[in-house]
Design a protein with these regions (language model features):
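Bacterial Sec-dependent N-terminal signal peptides
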Residues: 1-17
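Mature catalytic domains of secreted/periplasmic carbohydrate-active enzymes
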Residues: 16-419, 426-447
Length: 448
């Protein structure tokens, strides 16, 4: 790290102005930045199976990942730089990766380990071993085994709506009671309320996992995060961490307010999820299918997704497939490892950096340097304060150039611009709702 000079011109506003601030748990989640979402379901073993063809579910004996190794999963996640991992414990088929007591369609009746295994327990143990925070996805809205889609039981199924809701409550109770504290809980498609015929999830999460971050969780939970409106790893720009209640649930339909609002009443930041493969691949790239390695995103494409997710004030959640052996495929391990190395190469070591309070920060470089990107970070413990900003560069000849501009900064903004040789950079907060507190203003030398 190179020493640099800081100049601060204070803005005319109160430092203690009223702004929405995250709690300590939400701050910890923002610091995590990178997670993985691990997928394995019955389709991995029976590719022609469509869980919406009710009554056609494969026999549970078809599920047999004979080489399953959750340590391999977490070792790979570590190479990416992931701080947390979310296991899809039950996806659309209804097949459950733990020996649930709620119904018979689970590992308890599979060929794998003679029905005595528990993938959720193995996953939690591996997370602890590798220092990765664990999370669980359990889809409350879809269950092909019980003829349910979007939270509503279809005609001809084995259970009533009331019985299905009891299954949901029992399974969530098992997952939230038997495996310790969870860092994140994933509600795919949001949560139907009891008024919408759904199970009463809010009291359960408040009682059993009050500290968990909840993706698209029930309104009333303290630690909500929201969908960004796509599964491409591209957060909207701007993407404020404060949002209205309408943006934190029901990802099934197109919803308004995906950008959030700087004056919204809830701290509810975005999480950008995407797969390692193009969405034209099997199950949108979320599930493994033999022969689709060529559909993986290139390293350049993945780096762009990092910059449009983490670099736009959201966390990045990479979808990772588990194959029919129970392993992350070799080709995927290589690409994920390369992705992590590229993130660290591009953003692990700054050329210069500083921090400070006020509407104008100056970053002096030790010598004329060709730069092409900066990282900006607010101290979000004091809320998001900057509304608009621009970046200036001073060339060796003394010319001042406007390099880029933007709206929100939040936890992290990565701003790229055409390479330019500069001796100093100036960050100017053009508008703000309280005195800006910049915890990190970092410049990076052009690598190419």
């Amino acid at each position: 790290l190179v020493a640099c000079t800081l100049t601060i011109l204070a803005g005319s506003c109160r430092e203690d102005a009223e702004v929405i601030c995250p709690n300590a748990i939400q701050q910890e989640w923002a610091e995590a930045e990178i997670g993985v979402l691990l997928h394995m379901d019955m389709q991995v073993f029976v590719p022609d199976y469509n869980w919406r063809n009710y009554g056609s579910h494969p026999d549970p004996s078809a599920f047999n990942p004979a080489e399953l190794d959750t340590d391999q999963w977490m070792e790979t996640a570590s190479k990416l730089g992931a701080r947390y991992a979310v296991l899809v414990a039950k996806h659309g088929s209804g097949f459950s990766l733990w020996p649930t007591e709620a119904h018979d369609y689970s590992v308890r009746n599979s060929s794998w380990r003679d029905g005595k295994g528990d993938i959720v327990a193995d996953f939690i143990a591996s997370c602890k071993k590798y220092g990765i925070k664990p999370g669980i996805y359990a889809n409350t809205n879809a269950n092909g085994y019980l003829y349910t889609d979007r939270g509503r039981v279809r005609e001809g199924g084995p259970v009533s709506q009331v019985e299905y809701n009891a299954v949901v409550a029992k399974q969530l109770t098992e997952l939230w009671s038997n495996y310790g504290n969870l860092f994140e809980i994933w509600f795919d498609g949001g949560v139907l309320t009891p008024k919408e015929v759904g199970a009463d999830v809010l009291p359960l999460v408040k009682k059993l996992q009050p500290d968990a971050i909840a993706f698209q969780g029930p309104l009333g939970h303290d630690n909500l995060i929201r969908w960004v409106g796509n599964e491409q790893g591209t957060a909207p720009d701007p993407c404020w961490a404060t949002a209205d209640s309408t943006t934190n649930s029901d990802g099934v339909k197109i919803i308004e307010g995906l950008h959030g609002r700087p004056d919204a009443p809830f701290w509810c930041p975005g999480e950008s999820d995407f797969t390692l493969r193009y969405n034209t691949s099997f199950e949108g790239g979320w599930m493994w299918h033999e022969g689709q390695d060529s559909l993986m995103f290139s390293l350049d494409e993945l780096m762009e997704k990092y910059e449009t997710s983490v670099g736009r004030n959201t966390n990045m959640l990479l979808g990772v497939v588990i194959d029919n052996r129970g392993l992350i495929p070799d080709a995927d391990v290589r690409r994920i490892t390369e992705f992590g190395e590229a993130i660290r190469k591009n953003y692990g070591t700054t050329t210069v950096r500083t921090s400070g309070k006020g509407s104008n920060l100056t970053l002096k470089l030790p010598a004329p340097t060709l730069v092409d990107r900066v990282i900006l970070q607010e101290d979000i413990a004091k809320g998001e304060r900057v509304l608009t900003w621009h970046l200036e560069g001073v060339t060796p000849s003394g010319e001042t150039l406007t390099l880029c501009d933007g709206t929100n900064i939040g936890h992290k903004r990565i701003a790229r611009f055409d390479p330019v040789g500069v001796v100093s950079l100036h960050l100017v907060a053009d508008s703000y709702k309280a005195r800006p507190i910049i915890r990190n203003f970092a410049a990076f030398e052009c690598l190419n």
